[in-house]
Regions:
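Canonical Rossmann dinucleotide-binding motif of NAD(H)/NADP(H)-dependent dehydrogenases/reductases
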Residues: 159-204
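Catalytic Tyr-X3-Lys loop
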Residues: 270-379
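A glycine-rich helix->loop->beta "capping" turn
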Residues: 124, 221-225, 243-256, 268
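C-terminal helical subdomain
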Residues: 299-337, 465-512
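Active-site helix of classical SDR
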Residues: 382, 420, 424
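Conserved glycine-rich Rossmann-like NAD(P)H-binding loop of the short-chain dehydrogenase/reductase
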Residues: 193-211, 225, 253-258, 263-291
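Conserved Rossmann-fold SDR core element
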Residues: 223, 250, 436-451, 496-503
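Amphipathic alpha-helical dimer-interface segment in Rossmann-like NAD(P)H-dependent oxidoreductases
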Residues: 64, 74-75, 81-111, 137-141, ...
Length: 512
């Protein structure tokens, strides 16, 4: 190697490294001279000569342990660089951008009049590593502009489903659990299709405020009614069904979305209670209108019985009743005041929750609650409201029982955790499997639908560690979950093909 080449290779701009570079240049020049004339070594004292030989030998051919350590360090550097580049591409996708926002922003389905779709056309990216598609399970390298875990074909299809609508003008839909997350997004989608919507939730006033805050609320707010209902109280569910049968002219769609996966103690809900207990007349007029059908009978009961209102008129209050010992162990250290998550729900800092429980750790109370909410209440609603659904002659009605793959029997990877929620979803699936044929004969198409992997249900600390150490991110968001549970209705109306008696995952039938 010539001095010119050496200078070029050692020409680094870092001035702090200049002394080291000078030593390296001198060492390189010495070795080059000795290579030309080895007799020069004989001029050195023997101990210096041996020292030089040992240093050159160790540098050129280190021992096995040092060599292995150097190779592993180099591999780690290469892997870290590749991971950094891959994460940069994945972090640029739309789904991760939405997830980083302090508050989840509902996508604007209807673009403004001056919107230029060509100018805003997002670009796909390429990954240096092979990725695994969440839907079709195939390997891919082209990263969709929105999804970080789908191949281009699956991503394009799923992205189109997020904003797909149908004309449901004049139709009436019942949606349980429509206050937050998937239920809330499903509610917005139904309202934007033109349907009249009845929403149930334990916290009707909080729910009303959320819907009223939407930019296009004035376009559909008059078609929305919100009822307070705690699905754990079966007489309340029965009373609610009787009220709908006696007051509604028709019912076209039922979406049984309300469920309990992770049980929360009373302190989780405390921050909403002031609003739920406040006098209705102090609330804005647009919110009062959403609650009239619920608040008027509630007011009559309160007036007749004083403070001892029936459970069906005090859904929010039931959330504050401690039922197990853990319900008394809350506090600001577990549920810090004022700290809300991306869905504007209370942050839960417990180190362990229902998602981590083994069978012998599940309380009888939680076991019964999960069955009542996830299986018994949908059974009652579907049964008691069938006459109302048959009141009009159309044969394109739908019942969606929102389920999960945890309720599948034909699933290879079944964990030992949360057996009680698995049982409830399996029971819900069996109801669909059994009753769908009967209901289809009356023009009512019943299906179970998996929402997809939208949320990491683990405690906050464990979920954060999985993201940092395993690079884990849920492959879908709540808009995807809503699109999935409403697809039997929207796709059926748009195509005229109404599926029934199926367990649907990723918009297609799957094993029970």
């Amino acid at each position: 190697m010539s001095n010119t080449e050496t200078d070029r290779l050692l020409d680094f701009p870092d001035t702090a490294a200049q002394p080291l570079l000078g030593n390296v240049r001198a060492a390189a020049e010495l070795l080059e001279c000795l290579t030309v004339d080895r007799a020069l070594l004989e001029q050195l004292p023997a101990d210096h000569r041996e020292r030089l030989h040992r240093a050159v030998a160790k540098f050129y051919h280190p021992d096995k342990i040092a060599r292995r350590q150097r190779l592993k360090a180099a591999e780690r550097e290469v892997t870290a660089a590749q991971t950094e580049r891959a994460d940069a591409a994945l972090n640029g996708t739309g789904i991760r951008t939405l997830r980083r926002k302090p508050v989840f922003t509902t996508p604007n389905v209807f673009p403004p009049p001056d919107f230029d779709s060509r100018a805003a056309e997002p670009q796909d990216a390429a990954s240096a590593e092979l990725l695994h598609c969440y839907v079709c399970k195939q390997k891919f390298q082209i990263i969709h502009h929105f999804y970080d875990q789908m191949c281009p074909e699956c991503a394009t299809f799923n992205f189109s489903k997020r904003t797909e609508l149908a004309d449901l003008t004049g139709r009436v839909a019942l949606l349980t659990g429509g206050r937050v997350k998937i239920g809330y997004q499903a509610g917005l989608k139904l309202l934007r299709t033109g349907a009249r919507l009845i929403v149930t939730t334990r916290f009707p006033r909080d729910s009303a405020q959320r819907y009223a805050a939407e930019a296009d609320f004035s376009e559909w707010g008059h078609r929305l009614e919100i009822f307070g209902l705690d699905m754990r109280h079966t007489p309340s569910v029965e009373a609610f069904c009787r009220q709908l049968v006696s007051t509604l002219p028709r019912l076209d769609f039922i979406i049984n979305n309300a469920c309990q996966t992770v049980r929360r103690p009373p302190d989780f809900y405390t921050h909403m209670m002031e609003g739920e207990r406040a006098a209705l007349e102090h609330m804005p007029a647009e919110i009062r209108k959403l609650l009239c059908a619920y608040e008027e009978p509630r007011g009559e009961v309160l007036q007749r019985t004083g403070l001892q209102a029936r459970p069906q008129t005090r859904a929010a209050e039931l959330s504050q009743v401690p039922l197990i010992a853990e319900d008394l162990l809350g506090g600001n250290h577990l549920f810090p005041e004022g700290r809300l998550d991306q869905d504007l729900q209370q942050v839960d800092l417990r180190g362990r929750n229902s998602w981590r429980l083994l069978m012998d750790e599940v309380s009888s109370v939680e076991l019964l609650e999960v069955q009542l909410i996830n299986a018994v209440a949908p059974f009652i609603i579907n049964a008691r409201l069938k006459p109302l659904m048959m009141r009009t002659p159309e044969r394109d009605k739908h019942i969606v029982n929102v389920s999960a793959v945890e309720g599948q029997f034909y699933r290879n990877c079944k964990t030992t955790r949360h057996p009680h929620t698995n049982m409830a979803k399996a029971a819900l699936n069996m109801m669909t499997r059994t009753a769908a044929t009967d209901y289809q004969g009356d023009g009512i198409h019943m299906n179970s639908v998996d929402t997809g992997w939208v949320t990491d249900e683990d405690p906050v600390e464990i979920a954060a560690r999985k993201t940092a150490e395993q690079r884990f991110h849920p492959p879908l968001d709540i808009v995807d979950g809503a699109a999935r549970i409403l697809d039997p209705i929207i796709s059926g109306i748009n195509t005229g093909e109404h599926v029934w008696g199926q367990f649907l995952k990723d918009y297609r039938p799957t094993d029970w």
